[in-house]
Each structure stands twice: as structure tokens, then as C-alpha cells.
Amino acid sequence: REKNYSKAQEYYEKVLTINPNFVPAANNLAYIYAEHGGNIDVALNLAQKAREKLPEDANIADTLGWIYYRKNVFGTAITYLKEAADKMPEQPVVRYHLGMAYYKNGNRDLARQELSKALAISTEFDGAGEARKALEDL
């Protein structure tokens, strides 16, 4: 099924205009910006605000980690993504995110471990192709 990210982005932006404190919309919009070419600094700001309101939320930790990954701040990315993976060990996208952060940070063994776990959980997730390519390179 095709995902309509521009429609989702528009929806989340409207929701935040009405209720700027609605954390799920802030988190999801931050992720869309990070993943689909939006302003990465705006994404980071949204995710940080979401984190302040729900500091224990694993989805927000994943979003923050992926934004730091996109900003090439791999050490910080790993911290958040490890937290997300510890809280949601069966989420292949989270394992993929953590594996890619390890990969870019030069942690080859941990990258291989996390990317393999992601693909063992599911072979179809956003980033599965990139995970397979990275594993071939390891």
C-alpha cells in the first residue's frame, strides 16, 4: 500500500496549529520531516518538545535517534536508538535504525547484529532494502 506522506504532513501540521501540545502529531511530523526531506532542524525541535512531554516514550526516542542519524551525529543517535530498541525489541524499523547508526559509526559487529535482527523479524519494512545492502557491505 502506498503511503501518502504529504497528506499526513499536512494533517499533522493542521493538528499542531489547533493543539501545539499534541505529542503524537509532533512526533509523527518530526519523523516525516526527517525521512521525507523536510527541515531537519524543525524535525529535531518537534521531537525534542515531544520528548520533554513524554520522556519515556520509545517511539519518540526512535524519532530523535533517527533525526540525529540524519544529522550525522551518530553517537547521540545510538543513545536514543538503543533506548528505543530496548523498549521495543520486536520492531524491525527500530532495529534497522540502530543498526544503521552503528554502521555509520564504524561499529561493524553491532551493526551486523542489529540489521540481522531487523530482517529476522520482518523482511518487509521501510528501509529493508537499505538494511540488506549495508549487511552485504559488512
Name the predicted role of every residue range.
Residues I18, E52-K53, D86-M88, I121:
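Structural marker of alpha-solenoid helical repeat scaffolds
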Residues Y31-I32, W66, M100:
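Residue-level recognition of tetratricopeptide repeat
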Residues R1-K14, H36-K49, K71-E83, G106-K117:
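Structural signature of tandem alpha-helical TPR/SEL1-like repeats
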Residues N28, T63, H97, A131-A134:
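Canonical tetratricopeptide repeat
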Residues E52, E56-Y80, A84-D86:
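Generic long, charged, amphipathic alpha-helical segments
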Residues G38, D109-L138:
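Terminal, low-structured helical/coil segments at or just beyond the last alpha-helical repeat
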